[in-house]
From Swiss-Prot:
<comment type="pathway">
    <text>Amino-sugar metabolism; N-acetylneuraminate metabolism.</text>
</comment>
<dbReference type="GO" id="GO:0005634">
    <property type="term" value="C:nucleus"/>
</dbReference>
<dbReference type="GO" id="GO:0008781">
    <property type="term" value="F:N-acylneuraminate cytidylyltransferase activity"/>
</dbReference>
<feature type="binding site">
    <location>
        <position position="97"/>
    </location>
    <ligand>
        <name>substrate</name>
    </ligand>
</feature>
<feature type="binding site">
    <location>
        <position position="48"/>
    </location>
    <ligand>
        <name>substrate</name>
    </ligand>
</feature>
<keyword id="KW-0548">Nucleotidyltransferase</keyword>
<dbReference type="InterPro" id="IPR023214">
    <property type="entry name" value="HAD_sf"/>
</dbReference>
<feature type="binding site">
    <location>
        <position position="108"/>
    </location>
    <ligand>
        <name>substrate</name>
    </ligand>
</feature>
<dbReference type="Pfam" id="PF02348">
    <property type="entry name" value="CTP_transf_3"/>
</dbReference>
<feature type="binding site">
    <location>
        <position position="38"/>
    </location>
    <ligand>
        <name>substrate</name>
    </ligand>
</feature>
<protein>
    <recommendedName>
        <fullName>N-acylneuraminate cytidylyltransferase A</fullName>
        <ecNumber>2.7.7.43</ecNumber>
    </recommendedName>
</protein>
<dbReference type="InterPro" id="IPR050793">
    <property type="entry name" value="CMP-NeuNAc_synthase"/>
</dbReference>
<comment type="subunit">
    <text>Homotetramer.</text>
</comment>
<feature type="region of interest" description="Disordered">
    <location>
        <begin position="1"/>
        <end position="29"/>
    </location>
</feature>
<keyword id="KW-0539">Nucleus</keyword>
<feature type="active site">
    <location>
        <position position="187"/>
    </location>
</feature>
<dbReference type="InterPro" id="IPR003329">
    <property type="entry name" value="Cytidylyl_trans"/>
</dbReference>
Length: 430
């Protein structure tokens, strides 16, 4: 039977090696996701943990892998401590690769084989590219079934391209180029040509036996076709802004639906302000706020999102009261147990955690950051907060972080609403 791809078409199989393994051979397989994230990226330094749309790059694929629920284990192979910390924070295990497979000349297969040899319990490895932030759980779920249910030995992701290719000739030479996949006398229209399948590099599933032979694609092999909008790869800095826009539209943001956010809880010190209290010559205490942050709060309120300000530092209480009056938002202060107080508010408002957005900045916020449907911290927040948030702002506290997070909430709400409208369309009517 031919494999089914994302577009509902049949994927072609290749039995050329005759190494097909029956899915009945073993009732249970250990399937691992393996994300390669070397610290010495030449194109973009520490690219794998650079923030993309508020999430470390590897965070996008780790989240997709974990939420797919098809893997017995999800690993990040790295030689860098900071990458390891981020991987653990996002729910992956860490494989500390050896110096021998951490060189510029080391291939992905070298690293995968090292992992395979050190983890004998693993039967199938899915090498997921860290630079594919638009990967969704459903892509992995559907692809793994080609191995577990249809008996394929290796599966890799592809995208359909409609590019006309020409033979390369030496510069300065007098040789004529020739077409490689078209007849210029009968140039096809796009709609009349099915295009060509090209690897998009998102993932490669392979059984352990193939990997030990030095192959990621072999035996009874097939492809999984992904739509172009999900086929994003990042190699150089110039790709970053383009990828960010693509991710905001087509990326996977987790199981919780952002359109249900009804309440934003926002710290005053360390989020709305930069955490500093200024003293005038006359002894008056002052703080500064960014007008963009005030506008951001107004934008949320206009869209029906309630905003409550939080302040835990007694010295800043009077200033926080003045800010809450200026913002037109309720203020909660003197909280010995922030989590308990937030849950009390949720009961009063009849809300669940998935309906709450939380902007925090310190250790006292960690539990709320973890539980909130959408959470964020300013870029200058302490590491303990950065490691437990779903979104990290590009802007610092008191310098536009609140406005940025507000825009992120509204963008996800718009994205989800658009998807809901698309889901209501009756495709049979076309």
């Amino acid at each position: 039977m031919d494999a089914v791809n994302e577009n509902g078409k049949r994927a072609m199989k290749d039995d050329s090696h005759g190494n097909s393994t029956s899915p009945k051979r073993r009732k249970s397989r250990h399937i691992s996701a393996l994300i390669l994230a070397r610290g010495g990226s030449k194109g973009i330094p520490l690219k794998n943990i650079k923030m993309l749309a508020g999430v470390p790059l590897i965070g996008w694929v780790i989240r997709a892998a974990v939420d797919s629920n098809v893997f017995n284990s999800v690993w990040v192979s790295t030689d860098h401590e900071e990458i390891a910390k981020v991987a653990l924070a996002w729910g992956a295990k860490v494989h500390k690769r050896s110096p021998e497979v951490s060189q510029d000349s080391s291939s992905s297969l070298d690293t995968i084989r090292e992992f395979s040899r050190q983890h004998r319990e693993v039967d199938v490895i899915c090498n997921i590219q860290a630079t594919s932030p638009c990967l969704h759980p459903k892509h992995l779920t559907e692809a793994v079934e080609l191995i577990t249910k249809q008996g394929y030995d290796s599966v890799f992701s592809v995208v359909r391209r409609h590019n006309f290719r020409w033979k390369e000739v030496e510069k300065g030479g007098d040789c004529s180029t020739e077409p490689m996949n078209l007849n210029p006398a009968c140039r096809p229209r796009r709609q009349d040509w099915s295009g060509e399948l090209c690897e998009n590099g998102s993932f490669y599933f392979a059984k352990k036996e193939l990997i030990e032979q030095g192959l990621l694609q072999g035996g009874k092999k097939t492809y999984y076709e992904m739509k172009p909008e999900y086929s994003v790869d990042i190699d150089v800095d110039i790709d970053w802004p383009v990828a960010e826009q693509r991710v905001l539209r087509f990326g996977y943001f987790g199981k919780d639906k952002p359109e249900v956010v009804r309440l934003l809880l926002c710290n005053v010190s360390g989020c709305l302000t930069d955490g500093q209290i200024y003293t005038s010559a006359s002894g008056e205490e002052m703080v500064s706020i960014n007008i963009r942050d005030q506008i951001g709060i107004s934008m949320l309120k206009k869209e029906g999102v309630k905003v409550i300000l939080l302040e835990t530092y007694p010295i800043a209480k009077a200033l926080a009261v003045r800010l809450s009056e200026r913002m037109g938002c309720p203020l909660l202060h003197h909280m010995d147990d922030k989590l308990k107080e937030v849950e009390r508010i949720m009961v009063e408002e009849k809300l669940e955690w998935k309906e709450v957005a939380y902007l925090g900045n310190d250790e006292a916020d960690v539990k709320c950051l973890e539980l909130a449907g959408l959470s964020g911290v300013p870029v200058d927040a302490p590491t303990v907060a950065l490691n437990h948030t779903k979104y990290t702002c590009h802007n610092a506290a008191g310098h536009g972080a609140v406005r940025e997070f507000a825009e992120h909430i509204l963008l996800l709400k718009k994205k989800a609403k658009s998807q809901m409208e698309q889901d209501r369309i009756c495709r049979d009517a076309f």
